[in-house]
A protein has these predicted regions:
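Surface-exposed, active-site-proximal loop segments in enzymatic domains
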Residues: 65-75, 116-118, 263
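Short catalytic/ligand-binding loop motif for oxyanion handling, primarily in non-cytosolic enzymes
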Residues: 110-114
Length: 311
């Protein structure tokens, strides 16, 4: 029998590697009545559910609703597949193990909008383009991109943070006010469909699910929910003593990835649910992120592995 190895020098913040079982214990010496062990793409890991949270990122109408994100092709989109994996397996598994569910969403205030840096304003569309969606002088003032990585965004949707989307046709003669882009309490910034129902059902005191750990909806004003110091998410995690984070949502390489890497730098344990995340970015973006998470920032697992985690 080989001796366990401590990873880290801080007496309150360390892991333990158990070579005989190839398991990394992330519990930091805390006692748990029901620690769980789950498989990842590398080691098996052991976590304390009481110190863990499933962070579901940006599953909002703006990013998912077919009224503003029409499907291309016949099959389900990557985001739809991730949504089903979470709804059918990932979220129920987290609840069954007693893991807190955090809904991390864009939800801007007027102050956020007035202090938003230009880089983020550009991301969501703020300057004029030609009707074709291409810059009039493209090729004259920019370098070539090979392969072509220039993304043509829908100008009806990407019209600028805080800009009113106007009426949104939901089908069957049903129309809703889309509201201002990603502003708090607007339709477009609300949780999408089944995720909204899932959140509200958990918050309902009559629901017989995880009453001791109600879901929490936390707003963010950047791609990362943990940027800077003292974010709403960071304050909540510190108050609850949460040290292990399982990540899901959209987009893998943008808001999910930004929050994950900030969490890694702040010392949280980072676990990516690869089938519970998605992105529309081509060029193998998801695989690159999974590779980096597995080899550098933490661990990669699946919703099924979470469901089948042993106690």
């Amino acid at each position: 029998m080989r001796s366990p190895q401590t990873i880290g020098h801080d007496a309150t913040n360390f892991w333990v590697y158990e070579p005989d079982s190839d398991t990394i214990d992330l519990c930091r010496g805390t006692k748990s009545n029901d620690p769980i062990s789950l498989k990842t793409t590398r080691n098996q890991i052991r976590i304390n559910p009481q110190k863990s949270a499933l962070v579901v990122i940006d599953m909002q109408n703006f990013f998912l609703h077919p009224a503003v994100r029409p499907r291309v092709g016949n099959g389900p989109t990557a985001a739809e597949e991730a949504a089903q994996a979470l709804l059918n397996t990932g979220i129920p598994a987290a609840r069954a193990h007693g893991i807190r569910v955090i809904w991390l969403c864009w939800g801007l205030t007027e102050h956020d909008l007035n202090t938003m840096p230009p880089g983020l304003m550009r991301t969501f569309g703020t300057y004029d383009t030609s009707p074709s969606g291409a810059k009039q002088n493209e090729g004259e003032t920019s370098l070539p991109s090979a392969p072509n990585m220039i993304r043509k965004k829908n100008p009806a949707l990407y019209k600028g943070l805080g800009t009113d989307l106007g009426d949104v046709e939901l089908g069957d003669d049903n129309t809703v006010q889309g509201g201002r882009v990603l502003m708090r309490d607007s339709w477009n910034a609300a949780l999408y469909d089944q995720f909204d129902k899932e959140y509200k059902a958990n918050r309902d005191s009559r629901a017989d699910i995880t009453r001791k750990k109600p879901d929490v909806l936390i707003h963010k004003d950047r791609m990362s929910g943990l940027w800077g110091s003292g974010s709403e998410l960071e304050i909540f995690l510190e108050q609850e003593g949460i040290t292990t984070l399982l990540f899901a949502g959209v987009n893998t390489d943008q808001c999910v990835g930004s929050t994950l890497t900030d969490a890694y730098s702040k010392g949280y344990d980072c676990i990516l649910l690869r089938d519970g995340t998605a992105t529309g970015t081509p060029f193998g973006a998801s695989e690159v992120w999974e590779c980096n998470v597995s080899n550098c920032w933490g661990f990669v697992t699946t919703c099924d592995a979470l469901e089948n985690a042993s106690t």
